[in-house]
Swiss-Prot record:
GO terms for biological process: rRNA processing. Residues 630-646, 762-793 have a biased composition (Acidic residues). Component of the RIX1 complex required for processing of ITS2 sequences from 35S pre-rRNA and the nucleoplasmic transit of the pre-60S ribosomal subunits. Regulates pre-60S association of the critical remodeling factor MDN1. This is Pre-rRNA-processing protein RIX1. The gene is RIX1. Residues 471-481 have a biased composition (Basic residues). PANTHER family: PROLINE-, GLUTAMIC ACID- AND LEUCINE-RICH PROTEIN 1 (PTHR34105:SF1).
Length: 793
């Protein structure tokens, strides 16, 4: 039985609830089933799927929708049955109500989205199937948006992006529904919605200007200014709590931002506003939290306007956005004092909580602007300055550690944001502006003993009081202190009461330090503290290295610590090497790899080897071979060298490493140089002995020969030497050559002339193709020997 028959049998009328799931798995995992299906089997499969979709049973309907989902991946099936599939799915949307399981609606919309994706881009299918049904689909999906907002908005977002003209009549209705979501009109506040739902709401809101027929870029720019002006209006509410006059620059910054009056001049009015006017009542703390909720919602919406990617040909107001963020960070209790009517500590604490949420939203917006990279580099100093406003300080410009730990989530995002902006540059010349952030990061990862320390301190105070009391009341009967037993655990096992640093905070600090040590030269104090934190991380992960892998963030930090040690007396290589055993960069420091030495082909060595083999040949044979084809000699030398290398590699019995080959080549070259030096010394010694031991007639006959023959004779002497084991010279041919000259004493002139002619011809041939160099001629020595020969005559 074939697989398609199993599929058809599984979706038959008498199918069970367990049989349809394996069929769906087969169709999803094996795409060749639908490619090899026959026409009759395809008709049966399509008809059975449509019957399941039209069924009144919820499970059967769900099975039919998912079957169409799998069949939509085949173009042939979509071309033949796409109209039927579209009609069946639209019928499911029309019949849906709140009493039906929401999974039916979700699967139906997802199946429609897949079917539209397969049809989109194909002109014939789009014209015949999608275009006639598109308006109906938009209407039905917008009508069910309150049941499953995320799924419906995903489909509507695709329709707006690919079919803006068709969606234009529905733009205002969709905008109204989105504003209801932003205001929390469906019973759930926007800030309490899932992250994915908030994202798709803001993305859909930001892409609506694309449907404008005329100047969509201008519409997008007006929307961005409206959002910024609304945020500015909400921030002005803090003027009721703080004295803005304490910071003279704050008023100037607010004046640069568009306000409600400018928005009214543009003709927008209150129609484009997202939120209504705020009503603050100190007796209702929830009204104060509405400030941070609205600011967070508007900043998220502004983020998707800037980086959403709906309209690409627009001019981004980066300067205006940075000014808005500077205003957000400047509203801070560190620089502004509370007004006299805000005296309640609880109200001040609530206002501080609202400010922390507002600052967190501003940091998230600033981090999202990293998409523009190079355009932000000229503003780096301004960005670091405005972020420094958030660092809490106490007297003597010290970090308020308690405030940092209390608002850990805010400062963890702050440190991570600074690290992300450091990644935009290769180096920072002035590291003084980053020192406060380094102190904040070090405070976040310091061992925390808040609860245990307080309990320990109170226990110590209690013991001190008891001791003082016992001294004053010596006569009273001693009673057992019931609270001493629990306090003893704190005193003896203090490490068990330490708080654990959250993983998210630890990852943010590790990334920040990884960027800082590579691009900033820190002061010695901060550098030593940073290195201490890194070593502490090494110690913590050293014992667990065998049980779990080192996280990537920590691995990068340790490698950068080795590459950028900072001060010479600090070296973390030993402990880092014990943790990152398999890291290729660390292994280079532990085992340096020297490059392989280059191999040089020594011409003198190859010629010496060739001459040694020709010692027993006659003088005429040697002269003929010497004046032969040099190219042939070079080829023979190369072959000999190759044979020696092959034999050496075979004799070794194993493959040598690059380091061993380099050492072997170096030793071979040293041996060759020593051999050449010994040969030169032997030749010089032979020439000297020949000059002193020769008879006058012998010297006369030798010096009578022409200068060219003497040069040739010197060349023969240099090339006819054999060196023994201990550097002694043996088996020279000087004797035989000299004896030949003495026996032919009468024919010296003729031989000299003939040899001179042959040498001239040989010299011409050598100049054409020979690689041998003519030895140097000692002109002064030849002249002296000629004069001595003439006197002897």
């Amino acid at each position: 039985m074939s697989i398609i028959n199993i599929v058809l049998e599984g979706i038959s009328e008498n199918h069970s609830s367990q049989s349809i799931v394996p069929v769906l798995e087969l169709l999803r995992n094996d795409k060749t089933i639908l490619s090899n299906i026959s026409k009759l089997q395809l008709q049966q499969l399509v008809s059975r799927s449509l019957q399941l979709v039209r069924s009144s049973d919820s499970y059967s309907k769900w099975c039919g929708i998912n079957l169409i989902h799998q069949l939509s991946s085949n173009y042939v099936i979509v071309a033949q049955s796409g109209v039927q599939f579209m009609s069946a799915l639209i019928a499911v949307l029309e019949s849906y109500n709140s009493t039906i399981n929401v999974l039916i609606l979700r699967n139906c919309i997802e199946c429609l989205q897949v079917l539209m994706h397969e049809i989109r881009g194909k002109p014939a299918l789009t014209r015949e199937i999608l275009t006639p049904k598109l308006s109906t689909i938009i209407t039905l999906v917008m009508g069910h948006i309150q049941f499953d907002a995320e799924t419906c908005l995903n489909l509507l977002y695709d329709v707006i992006l690919h079919h803006p003209n068709t969606f234009r009549p529905f733009a205002n209705k969709l905008r109204s529904k989105l504003l209801v979501f932003l205001k929390g009109g469906f019973g759930v506040e926007f800030v309490e919605m899932p992250t994915s739902l908030r994202k798709i709401i803001c993305q859909t809101m930001a892409i609506l200007p694309i449907i404008e027929k005329n100047e969509p870029e201008a519409k997008w720019g007006n929307d961005v200014k409206n959002v910024i002006s609304e945020v500015t209006g909400i921030l002005n509410v803090f003027d009721e709590f703080f004295n803005f006059r304490d910071d003279s620059s704050l008023g100037k910054l607010i004046s640069k931002l568009p306000g409600r009056g400018e928005r009214a001049e543009l003709g927008e009015g209150d129609r484009e506003r997202v939120f209504d006017d705020l009503s603050i009542d100190f007796n209702e703390p929830r009204s104060l939290l509405a400030i941070s909720d609205q600011v967070e919602t508007l900043l998220q919406l502004l983020k998707h306007y800037l980086v959403g990617g709906g309209i690409t040909s627009v001019r981004l107001p980066l300067g205006l956005c940075l000014t808005l963020l500077e205003v957000v960070f400047s509203i801070n209790a560190r620089f502004l004092s509370y007004k006299s009517d805000v005296r309640d500590d609880e109200i001040r604490q609530l206002i501080s909580t609202v400010l922390n949420r507002v600052h967190t939203s501003g940091i998230e917006l600033l981090s999202s602007l990293l998409q523009f990279r190079g355009a932000l580099v000229p503003h780096l100093n301004q960005i670091w300055t405005m972020l420094e406003y958030l660092v809490p300080m106490i007297q003597n410009k010290r970090i308020d550690a308690a405030e940092v730990v209390k608002n850990e989530a805010v400062f963890a995002k702050l440190v991570e944001c600074v690290g992300l902006y450091l990644n935009l540059v290769g180096a920072v010349s002035d590291g003084a502006s980053l020192v406060p952030f380094v102190d904040v990061a070090l405070t976040l990862v310091e061992p925390r003993k808040d609860s245990a320390g307080n309990m320990q301190q109170s226990a110590a105070d209690g013991q001190q009081k008891n001791q003082n009391k016992n001294k004053n009341q010596k006569n009273k009967i001693k009673k057992k202190n019931a609270s001493s037993a629990p306090m003893s655990d704190i005193l003896s096992h203090e490490h068990l009461f330490q708080q654990t640093i959250p993983t998210q905070t630890l990852l943010a600090v590790q990334y920040f330090f990884s960027q800082v040590i590579t691009k900033v030269e820190l002061p010695s104090n901060q550098h030593y503290k940073t290195l201490r934190f890194i070593i502490r991380q090494c110690v913590e992960h050293k014992n667990s290295n065998l049980e779990q892998a080192v996280p990537k963030q920590l691995r990068d930090l340790l490698v950068n610590t080795v590459l950028y040690p900072g001060y010479d007396k600090n070296n973390a290589l030993p402990i880092v090497s014990s943790i990152l055993i398999d890291d290729p960069i660390i292994s280079v420091f532990n085992n340096p790899r020297l490059p392989a030495l280059p191999k040089y082909h020594s011409m003198s060595t190859s010629m010496d080897n060739k001459d040694v083999t020709e010692v027993g040949l006659e003088q005429t044979t040697y002269q003929r071979n010497r004046n032969g084809d040099d190219d042939h000699d070079d080829d023979d030398d190369d072959d000999d060298d190759d044979d020696e290398e092959v034999s050496a590699s075979k004799g070794s019995g194993k493959k040598l490493s690059a380091k061993e080959l380099a050492i072997q080549n170096l030793m071979r070259e040293q041996a060759e140089r020593q051999k050449l030096d010994r040969e030169k010394e032997a030749n010089a010694r032979i020439e000297k002995d020949a000059e002193h031991e020769a008879t006058p007639s012998f010297a006369f006959q030798m010096e009578k020969r022409p200068r060219e023959e003497i040069v040739e004779e010197v060349g023969k002497v240099e090339k006819k030497i054999k060196v023994g084991e201990h550097g002694l010279v043996k088996d020279t041919v000087l004797k035989s050559t000299v004896e030949t000259v003495v026996d032919n004493k009468n024919d010296v002139a003729n031989v000299s002339k003939n040899d001179q002619a042959q040498d001239a011809v040989g010299a011409d041939e050598d100049n054409e193709g020979s690689d041998f160099e003519i030895p140097e001629i000692n002109m002064e020595l030849d002249t002296d020997e000629e004069e001595e020969g003439e006197e002897a005559e």
